[in-house]
């Protein structure tokens, strides 16, 4: 990222606190801003509907609840997002299989490459 362009701000949705903190640190190291970092489906829905951010990182399973209603909101708003899952892209329902997905655990370089493609 160049200094002349605004820093993309991201919505991070991850229910596991330590993973959410690690993800925030990775994003900071990669030069991204955090618009919000939340761990529940209700918080994610609210921010997805009203929030001001460039893209989102969505954990597929939030304490037993699936993230897909939030993904639908983002898609309707035209905002890019990437799924994060411990089960791989093939575990995503058919309508979401073409979307970017990172399989846990992933490295910062994988996140960097995925976000660069998402925001280009």
Task: Tell what function each PLM region has.
Residues 104:
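A Lys-centered signature of the CheY-like receiver
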Residues 17-36:
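Two-component/phosphorelay signaling modules centered on CheY-like receiver
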Residues 1-9, 42, 107-120:
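Non-catalytic signal-transmission and effector/linker regions of two-component phosphorelay proteins
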Residues 14:
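Conserved acidic carboxylate
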Residues 37-55:
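Acidic, metal-coordinating helix/loop segments flanking the phosphotransfer/catalytic sites
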Residues 59:
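Active-site residues of response regulator receiver
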Residues 66-69:
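Acidic catalytic/metal-coordinating carboxylates
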């Amino acid at each position: 990222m160049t200094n002349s362009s605004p820093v993309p701000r991201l919505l991070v949705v991850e229910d596991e606190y330590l993973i959410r903190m690690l993800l925030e640190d990775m994003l900071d190291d990669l030069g991204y801003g955090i618009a919000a970092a939340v761990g529940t489906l209700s918080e994610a829905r609210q921010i997805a509907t009203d929030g001001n951010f460039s893209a989102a990182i969505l954990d597929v399973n939030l304490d037993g609840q699936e993230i897909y209603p939030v993904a639908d909101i983002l898609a309707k708003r035209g905002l890019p997002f990437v799924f994060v899952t411990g089960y791989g892209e093939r575990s995503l329902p058919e309508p979401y299989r073409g979307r970017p997905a990172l399989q846990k655990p992933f490295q910062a370089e994988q996140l960097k490459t995925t976000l660069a493609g998402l925001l280009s």
